[in-house]
Amino acid sequence: MKDLTAKQRSVLIFIEEFIEKNGYPPSVREIARRFRITPRGAQLHLVALEKKGYIERKNGKPRAMRVTKSVKNRVPLIGEIRAGEKKEAIEYLEDYIEVPGSFLSSGYEHFLLRVKGESMIEEHICDGDLVLIRRQDWAQNGDIVAAMVEGEVTLKKFFQRGEMVELRPANKEMSPMFFRADRVKILGKVVGVFRKYEGGRTCFLTR
């Protein structure tokens, strides 16, 4: 089966969640309203999902569709993030990894990043871990976030005081970074951590 675009993936997840809640699939117009697109745009997404093998539909029946391959709990691993100094943003699809549904917030997109560096070790986020990020453009003080500053990304604890933002490491040997708030873009909040131990064991550490 072919890879989905981000929008196609979001549409498919919406269809799955709609069916779980209502017992039947959404109409084209309901999909269009959810994503603020035209009915034709929604129809094109359904055609693409069908061609790629993720749904099946019956001609002439607006709600006659079923999901043939679930992606609801499969999260894209899209590169690495520096837990240390800022680093040029690296974003490319490496893989999809299935995570427990309890770690995923309904209505949000999620993605995984591989951690490089040791600036967050006091929060039990270590070099080589995979952090699960809930995509959002805001944060509360104390949240661990993936943040972009002038095209470079970093993983830090977020604190804002007036017009200044502090990106604070969880490592006593490293210093915090300070920026004007308008220079900092929040990419998302850390909601989980994957760690692979010797012997191939994988577990979640935090949420």
Swiss-Prot record:
Tell whether 4Fe-4S is among the UniProt keywords. Answer: no
Ion transport as UniProt keyword = no
* DNA-binding region location: 28-47
GO MF assignments: DNA binding; serine-type endopeptidase activity
Cite the EC number. 3.4.21.88
- InterPro entries for this protein: LexA, LexA-like, LexA/Signal_pep-like_sf, LexA_DNA-bd_dom, LexA_repressor, Peptidase_S24_LexA, Peptidase_S24_S26A/B/C, WH-like_DNA-bd_sf
| Keyword list, A-Z | Autocatalytic cleavage, DNA damage, DNA repair, DNA replication, DNA-binding, Hydrolase, Repressor, SOS response, Transcription, Transcription regulation
The reactions it catalyses are: Hydrolysis of Ala-|-Gly bond in repressor LexA
Q: Which residues form the active site?
A: 119 (for autocatalytic cleavage activity), 156 (for autocatalytic cleavage activity)
List the residue(s) that the UniProt entry marks as the site Cleavage: 83-84
- Note the SUPFAM superfamilies from the entry: LexA/Signal peptidase (SSF51306), Winged helix' DNA-binding domain (SSF46785)
Instruction: Specify the enzyme's EC class, one word.
Output: hydrolase
A biological process from GO: DNA repair
Task: Provide the function of this protein.
Answer: Represses a number of genes involved in the response to DNA damage (SOS response), including recA and lexA. In the presence of single-stranded DNA, RecA interacts with LexA causing an autocatalytic cleavage which disrupts the DNA-binding part of LexA, leading to derepression of the SOS regulon and eventually DNA repair.
What family does the database annotate? Belongs to the peptidase S24 family.
Q: How does it assemble?
A: Homodimer.
Under the heading HAMAP family, the entry gives: LexA
Q: State the protein's name.
A: LexA repressor
What is the species listed in this Swiss-Prot or TrEMBL entry? Answer: Thermotoga neapolitana (strain ATCC 49049 / DSM 4359 / NBRC 107923 / NS-E)
